């Protein structure tokens, strides 16, 4: 029997999403204009909360759809303008180029990455040392590469690992739907579940590693560049200025990695099942045996392109996205990928997230137009100089957990610079505030996927449903890191930042401009 027109429309709306989720979004769309007529400020914060809700429910429905509907309505009712959204997109063009090209570029280096990380995984049998190595590697790479790039690398490796075992467990040699477990025996499902736990922990260690390394250098995160430019610091200056906070945080973060693995807290401690290790070992042995001279040349070419990638990013020879485009061109040309559809597969992972980030910029435009953060900024600047450092750090951390890091860092450094230029604070205090702003923006934001773009990218990637990594589970697994990084960072800002910076100046390592 044919269903009614209304029922058909309801089923099509947001597809397979639960009915309660569809109803909640409709209520949001009805309530927002009414609240906006009464209080634009309250409506602005309500929109932010609703957008966070769509991110939290990412596994129910990709946030681009509900978030996009909320953003379109916000522009339509006047919470912001289409022109302001365009300005925000233009201001963040580098980030969009990064997502479009750098993430796609990594796709053409997956053979090399899978080769390297397979050897790493098979050669290190201790889960603690393996977790530490993933965390350290991610931290080191994130000091030179964008965190999204590093996470994209680890995601591609994890999907490769998962795909290898899933094909064996399902007794299928060709590419299959990795989310389809219907052909897997009960015994294999138990092992697969343990393997998922193992991959979840590695992904979280690597994700936190990107935050540990990304905060240390001016090229580690997009907002770092903005803060460095506002303070007039170069690469070495930035590293030394941040080190009184970032070095102790890095050490404590790595110790936390070992601790949660040792004690099996917060969902960590799952080891690589021996059956999976055997499958990966067989795959590695078979791959090496079947590797032709042409395959070896591909690996060598990818390694050379990897050297070019790190060198170009470290020396900042061009914008990150353009370097990513050069990786695509070099890799496809030298490896021999010439078919348009084969090249197009590289963009499958990144473009939905690029669209989602563009929607997020419209929410940022609402935050600016409705001055949602103004009361907080005014409160902080009225405090004493000593209290300002901790307050800037704390409020940056709180806002960065629910908003865009680049936006929060930009707003605070601009306000601090304006206060310095007006004479409200000294140049020396401004430089200390720049450190507090940068560390406060980067460290506590690991608390939620909303705060770290790399975490959000992981949550909305094809890998997340495969390893059962939901929003809530990600927040839970990030909790020990959140507590350690936030508290150690706060203590360093409070007690070590000023005296160590003063000592650096006396040694002549840094100077006030």
From Swiss-Prot:
Pfam families the UniProt entry points to: NhaB (PF06450)
Function (record text): Na(+)/H(+) antiporter that extrudes sodium in exchange for external protons.
Catalytic activity: 2 Na(+)(in) + 3 H(+)(out) = 2 Na(+)(out) + 3 H(+)(in)
Topology in membrane: Multi-pass membrane protein
Protein name as annotated: Na(+)/H(+) antiporter NhaB
Keywords: Antiport, Cell inner membrane, Cell membrane, Ion transport, Membrane, Sodium, Sodium transport, Transmembrane, Transmembrane helix, Transport
Protein family: Belongs to the NhaB Na(+)/H(+) (TC 2.A.34) antiporter family.
TM region(s), chain numbering: 23-43, 52-72, 97-117, 120-140, 144-164, 202-222, 238-258, 303-323, 348-368, 391-411, 447-467, 475-495
Gene that encodes it: nhaB
Highest taxon, organism lineage: Bacteria
MF terms (GO), sorted A to Z: sodium:proton antiporter activity
Compartment(s) where it occurs, according to its Swiss-Prot or TrEMBL record: Cell inner membrane
Keyword Cell inner membrane among record annotations: yes
Recorded GO CC terms: plasma membrane
Source organism per UniProt: Shigella sonnei (strain Ss046)
